[in-house]
């Protein structure tokens, strides 16, 4: 009985204090290991009525890349057989504080799939959060100790995340129907 009480007290302290986020690897180098504390009160949240996006920054989901002008290849992500990201000339996303950030547009098999904005620093992340909450409503917060918010709609999924270690924020919206097509493609390729 004493042992059980000791274990329960230890687990309670561990939950209260948390686990250290840095560990040493076999070379003695410090590596970062994130610890996520679930938000037990979190519920799935949709977009505020009438605000679910059917694209991003004026580009509709599944629009063919060839239909757009001024797109410049930026990078390639190897996920799902390759997602090509582009920047659009003279294009930006306006944060809540008025700062403009570049937008990365992701295309899978030449079809528009996702829009993404990266921020640097807490001030700019908070401005992106302010803009997102104002336009789409407050997102679900799945973790108590992380700045992360999610929205799930009929055909769009949106996320807003901040990494306190790198001071980088990310805001993205992606097409759910395109995600399903991509997952089906990967499943076929594996067969």
Predicted ranges, named:
Residues 1-4:
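Positively charged n-region of N-terminal signal peptides that target proteins for export
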Residues 8-15:
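Bacterial N-terminal signal peptides
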Residues 20-81, 116-191:
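Non-cytosolic coordination micro-motifs
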Residues 52, 87-93:
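N-terminal post-signal-peptidase region of extra-cytosolic proteins
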Residues 74, 98-100, 112-114:
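A broad structural signal for short, well-ordered beta-strand segments within beta-sheet-rich domains
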Residues 92-97, 123:
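Short, cysteine-centered beta-strand-loop-beta hairpins and adjacent loop/turn segments enriched
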Residues 101-106, 158-160:
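Hydrophobic/aromatic beta-strand elements that line small-molecule binding cavities or substrate pockets
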Residues 103-120:
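Mid-length scaffold segments of soluble, non-membrane domains
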């Amino acid at each position: 009985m004493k042992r059980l009480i000791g274990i329960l007290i230890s687990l309670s302290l561990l939950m209260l204090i948390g686990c250290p986020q840095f560990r040493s690897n076999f070379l003695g180098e410090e590596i970062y290991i994130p610890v996520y504390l679930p938000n037990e009160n979190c519920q799935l949240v949709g977009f505020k009525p009438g605000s679910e996006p059917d694209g991003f920054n004026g580009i509709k989901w599944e629009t063919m890349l060839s239909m757009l002008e001024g797109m410049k290849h930026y990078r390639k992500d190897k996920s799902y057989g390759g997602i090509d990201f582009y920047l659009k000339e003279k294009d930006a996303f306006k944060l809540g504080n008025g700062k403009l950030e570049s937008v990365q547009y992701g295309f899978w098999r030449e079809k528009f799939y996702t829009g993404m904005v990266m921020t640097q620093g807490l001030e700019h992340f908070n401005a992106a959060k302010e803009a997102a909450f104002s336009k789409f409503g407050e997102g679900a917060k799945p973790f108590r100790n992380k700045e992360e918010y999610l929205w799930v709609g009929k055909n769009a999924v949106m996320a807003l995340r901040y990494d306190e270690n790198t001071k980088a924020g990310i805001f993205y919206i992606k097409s759910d129907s395109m995600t399903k097509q991509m997952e089906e493609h990967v499943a076929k390729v594996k067969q």
